[in-house]
């Protein structure tokens, strides 16, 4: 798992932050209000109504669960919610809250209607989660004082607050925890037009000269993810300052991204290595993941957790009962003629069932 995390951190098209410097860079570019937030129109519209209603009633906003792939703006939305409500935000993450006392200390220090943001909430320990249930429902927590026979339970009242939980794996949340969120929002991948608007806004904040076609060139290679779009913009800006007097056109962006091994659909060297192995070493598949891992010299976890998700989501790779299969899109992307067998992919499933 360590190797998987290391590879994800090294890829320029990774959806997770790659360094503390990048996290600071992201904070500087974050929109501060809902009206500045680009994309996720449905989620944004819902939050506008719920926040305004809570403010008119002078109540805390209902608890919010944000889920979806990394890099789509869950943390940004948590900060915006607190700012729109005019309250403080306390931020932590599931793995950090190891003991019940850690959570109790946070909850007892919240002021009225404050927002508590827990990232990776699916990684809360069961002990901490048990403390959270009464806090979410009744704004109370039970803590144990003393040890052994003299131990006793004390009930503490809390100020009304809003929990904003973020997760990339909603399926790992327990049902009791999931049921306590009144507002549940899934963040989707962005289209190229939305990402181009984000790139243009970020370039303005960075005082970078960018043409609309340059912004779109970056956007269409950003894998539907604002975090990747902003990271690519930083690298393209560096290239433009050295090679093009700081002027980012489509041609400059294309040259910069080719230098970074990011192709027209956002694939990097590892994506292409995996797909080309399936095409050339295994005749398009099906191939088992262990054989594929050996062929490209990567760990199985790296393939399943880092490389495959985007390829499958975009329709370039298919998982079948017999293994991984390259799709027609993959053949077209590499300029290859698809064999007749690839047009009969359902047959793979049929043969597996017999």
Curated annotation (Swiss-Prot):
Residues annotated as binding ATP: 29-30, 71, 74-76, 137-139, 180, 190, 227
Annotated signal sequence range: none
InterPro entries: AAA+_ATPase (IPR003593), AAA_lid_4 (IPR041445), DNA_helicase_Holl-junc_RuvB (IPR004605), P-loop_NTPase (IPR027417), RuvB-like_N (IPR008824), RuvB_C (IPR008823), WH-like_DNA-bd_sf (IPR036388), WH_DNA-bd_sf (IPR036390)
Catalytic activity reported: ATP + H2O = ADP + phosphate + H(+)
Renumbered residue ranges of the record's region Large ATPase domain (RuvB-L): 4-190
Residue positions binding DNA: 300, 319, 324
Keyword terms of this UniProt record: ATP-binding, Cytoplasm, DNA damage, DNA recombination, DNA repair, DNA-binding, Hydrolase, Nucleotide-binding
GO cellular component: cytoplasm; Holliday junction resolvase complex
Family according to the record: Belongs to the RuvB family.
Annotated protein name in UniProt: Holliday junction branch migration complex subunit RuvB
Lineage: Bacteria, Pseudomonadati, Pseudomonadota, Betaproteobacteria, Burkholderiales
Underlying gene: ruvB
């Amino acid at each position: 798992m360590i190797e998987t995390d290391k590879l994800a951190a090294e890829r320029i098209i990774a959806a997770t932050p790659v360094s503390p410097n990048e996290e600071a860079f992201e904070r500087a570019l974050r929109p501060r209000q809902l009206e500045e937030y680009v994309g996720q129109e449905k989620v944004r519209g819902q939050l506008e109504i719920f926040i305004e209603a809570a403010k008119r009633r002078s109540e805390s906003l209902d608890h919010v669960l944000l889920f979806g792939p990394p890099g789509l703006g869950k943390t940004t939305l948590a900060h915006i919610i607190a700012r729109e409500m005019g309250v403080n935000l306390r931020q932590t993450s599931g793995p950090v809250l190891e003991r019940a006392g850690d959570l109790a200390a946070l909850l007892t220090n919240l002021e009225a209607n404050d927002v508590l943001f827990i990232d990776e909430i699916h990684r809360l320990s069961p002990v901490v989660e048990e403390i959270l249930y009464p806090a979410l429902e009744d704004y109370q927590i039970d803590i144990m004082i003393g040890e052994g026979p003299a131990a006793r339970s004390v009930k503490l009242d809390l100020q009304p607050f809003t929990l904003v939980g973020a997760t990339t794996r909603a399926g790992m949340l327990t049902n009791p925890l999931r049921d306590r969120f009144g507002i549940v929002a899934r963040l989707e991948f962005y289209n190229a037009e939305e990402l181009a608007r984000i790139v243009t806004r970020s370039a303005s904040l960075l005082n970078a000269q960018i043409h609309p076609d340059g912004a779109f060139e970056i956007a269409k290679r950003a894998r539907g993810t604002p975090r990747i779009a902003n990271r690519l913009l930083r690298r393209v800006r560096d290239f433009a300052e050295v090679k093009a007097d700081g002027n980012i056109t489509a041609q400059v962006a294309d040259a910069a991204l080719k230098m970074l091994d990011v192709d027209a659909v956002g694939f990097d060297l590892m994506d292409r290595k995996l797909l080309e192995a399936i095409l050339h070493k295994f005749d398009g598949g099906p191939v088992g993941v262990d054989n594929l891992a050996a062929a490209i010299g990567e760990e199985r976890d790296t393939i399943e957790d880092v490389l495959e998700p985007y390829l499958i989501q975009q329709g370039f790779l298919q998982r079948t009962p017999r293994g991984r299969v390259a799709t027609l899109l993959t053949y077209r992307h590499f300029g290859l003629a698809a064999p007749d067998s690839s047009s009969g992919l359902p047959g793979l499933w049929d043969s597996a069932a017999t």
